[in-house]
């Protein structure tokens, strides 16, 4: 196991945005639904909804996109705006601190434009209150003046589409959630879909992929395109320094092993979590508070970042009594259950 003083400040397989991710993602991001790999049910539905809105010359219904980090929520929002042939203005929940911040964005929208709010679950209550009439009636209620002289005025807004993105749909208030006419959940990608994504990204990055190279990267990418693209960049570095720049299965395996991403896509934190359950708590069940204390990690990080992939891949179970390591987890580490 990796000791505490060996732990890097950022995980290579962390699905949240790091360093150069945003610039690279923007450069290789698909622009149309036809180029969007995976999420077939979402692509099919959005294609119909977008075409219908265009035929009626109306604004698309407000859209909520939710799912784990790194699956393409921002990409999908930009594709929707592109397919509608309208402008998109982008912001995030934490940035909109005051009602005036949101009002400034809303009053600068043209008819049918898209306003994209990332991390929409982090909107402050005062900003959220302003959003309700804007979404429902295309009106902006603002207060003019202060104290006894303060008065409310209504401003008409052009019809627009709000796209909200969140990793925590359950954290949205019911009044906000109910105002979205379209709700889409993004799922983890399978290996074949990620292989296609890695191949496409390699083409844009001028990386020559040979047999098995893209698939080896995809297998360790935890079902997440952002992680796949990040691993591809590290494999490219390795191939250029230790080889001739070409990426095959052997090169990809060597590079990813060097950066501590194993065959299952685990890094030190995944192994630490599973081994804590198996070795310290006899396989579970163990409560979230105890598990967080045992591995020195925040509860939200365990629930939102570490656990979804482990559960989806069958290494971990959540039960009413706590977390349990599955037989597959024991098999991965070559261990036998103690009970």
Swiss-Prot record:
Q: Where is this region: Head domain (RuvB-H)?
A: 263-339
Keyword Cytoplasm attributed: yes
Q: What is known of its domains?
A: Has 3 domains, the large (RuvB-L) and small ATPase (RuvB-S) domains and the C-terminal head (RuvB-H) domain. The head domain binds DNA, while the ATPase domains jointly bind ATP, ADP or are empty depending on the state of the subunit in the translocation cycle. During a single DNA translocation step the structure of each domain remains the same, but their relative positions change.
**Can you cite a GO biological process for this protein?**
DNA repair
Q: Where is this region: Small ATPAse domain (RuvB-S)?
A: 190-260
| Localization of this protein | Cytoplasm
What residues bind DNA, as annotated?
318, 323
| Annotated residues for binding of ATP | 28-29, 70, 73-75, 136-138, 179, 189, 226
One Gene Ontology MF term: four-way junction DNA binding
Q: Does the keyword DNA-binding apply?
A: yes
What keywords appear on the UniProt entry?
ATP-binding, Cytoplasm, DNA damage, DNA recombination, DNA repair, DNA-binding, Hydrolase, Nucleotide-binding
What top-level class of enzyme does the UniProt entry assign? Answer: hydrolase
Coiled coil spans:
none
Q: Where does Mg(2+) bind?
A: 74
User: Reaction(s) catalyzed by this protein?
Assistant: ATP + H2O = ADP + phosphate + H(+)
The cross-references to PANTHER family, in alphabetical order and at most eight, read: HOLLIDAY JUNCTION BRANCH MIGRATION COMPLEX SUBUNIT RUVB, PTHR42848
Q: Where is this region: Large ATPase domain (RuvB-L)?
A: 4-189
Q: Which domain of life is it from?
A: Bacteria
Q: What is its EC number?
A: 3.6.4.-
Quote the protein name from its UniProt record.
Holliday junction branch migration complex subunit RuvB
Major site of localization recorded for this protein: cytoplasm
Its quaternary organisation is:
Homohexamer. Forms an RuvA(8)-RuvB(12)-Holliday junction (HJ) complex. HJ DNA is sandwiched between 2 RuvA tetramers; dsDNA enters through RuvA and exits via RuvB. An RuvB hexamer assembles on each DNA strand where it exits the tetramer. Each RuvB hexamer is contacted by two RuvA subunits (via domain III) on 2 adjacent RuvB subunits; this complex drives branch migration. In the full resolvosome a probable DNA-RuvA(4)-RuvB(12)-RuvC(2) complex forms which resolves the HJ.
Family statement:
Belongs to the RuvB family.
Looking at the UniProt record for this protein, which Gene Ontology cellular component terms does it annotate, in alphabetical order? cytoplasm; Holliday junction resolvase complex
